[in-house]
Amino acid sequence: MVREFELSVAAVHRIVKKAGAERVSESAASELARILEEVGVDIAREALYFTLHAGRKTVRAKDVKAAYEKLFKFKRPYWFES
């Protein structure tokens, strides 16, 4: 069964290669695409919560950042540029 992802498998291949891999199997790229999509939906869902709580209809970058930090309990280092 071939599954369509929001992220292309080719893009995921490039991401894994950026991480230093010389070669990436199709199944590894597909699995990472599935996981990234799942994590992305979780972040988007949490960002929507922040948006609605603020009385807005538009999800903003600050909502996504806050959702990411809440879900992953990670504060970006001061040198991280957004």
Question: What are the roles of these predicted feature ranges?
Answer:
Residues 1-82:
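Histone-fold and other basic nucleic-acid-binding segments
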